[in-house]
Structures are given as structure tokens and as C-alpha cells.
A protein has these predicted regions:
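Residues within the DNA-recognition helix of helix-turn-helix
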Residues: 49
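Basic, amphipathic "hinge/linker" alpha-helix immediately C-terminal to the N-terminal HTH DNA-binding motif
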Residues: 66-85
Length: 99
């Protein structure tokens, strides 16, 4: 029997990263405020986890200004979408595994 645990991506072990990627998979782009509201986490938690996902190439970060107001938005990259899809598939296989 294949060990599906080994196919899970460690980048998505955190429930926060799992939440971030889940939101980004169904939205083209999400801004900081929306992500914070949806996940109910602190600014520091968002920044820390986004930074980790960005370093892996799974998330792109866009910073811009609307007038004088800064706006940061996030999107899943192609690599991020592929990695997250594989992670979800591994979870599904694990759930469907019979004894």
C-alpha cells in the first residue's frame, strides 16, 4: 500500500496556509483585508504565512496604491495551484484508503 502521508506537501501543514491557499484557489486575487476577515487571523500571521508561501513560489504578492491608500493583494501562482491540487488529491486518497 502506498504511503499517502509522504505525498502530502509540508508547506500546507498549517491550517492557516491551508486556508490561504483554499481561498486563493477559488479567487483570482484577494486583498489583505479580505484574507484577514475570512481567516480571522492577525496581520502578523498573514504576513508570516504569506511570506513562506511566496518564498516557495506558491503565492504572488502585488502592492499598489489607490490614491494614498496602500493595497496589498495575493494570488496563487501556477506552481502554487499545482502543488495545492496535488496536496488535496493526496488527502482525498488518504481519506478513501481502506484498511
Amino acid at each position: 500500500m502506498k504511503n499517502f502521508i509522504d505525498t502530502l506537501n509540508k508547506a500546507f501543514e498549517s491550517r492557516i496556509r491551508l486556508g490561504i491557499m483554499s481561498i486563493l484557489m477559488v479567487n483570482d486575487q484577494v486583498d489583505f483585508t479580505m484574507l484577514k476577515e475570512l481567516l480571522q487571523i492577525t496581520d502578523g500571521n498573514i504576513a508570516s504565512h504569506i511570506s513562506g508561501l511566496e518564498k516557495l513560489g506558491y503565492v504572488s504578492v502585488t502592492k499598489q496604491f489607490f490614491g494614498k491608500k496602500p493595497n496589498t493583494s495575493y494570488a496563487a501562482t501556477i506552481a502554487g495551484k499545482e502543488a495545492f491540487t496535488k496536496h488535496i488529491q493526496a488527502l482525498e486518497q488518504l481519506i478513501q484508503t481502506k484498511k
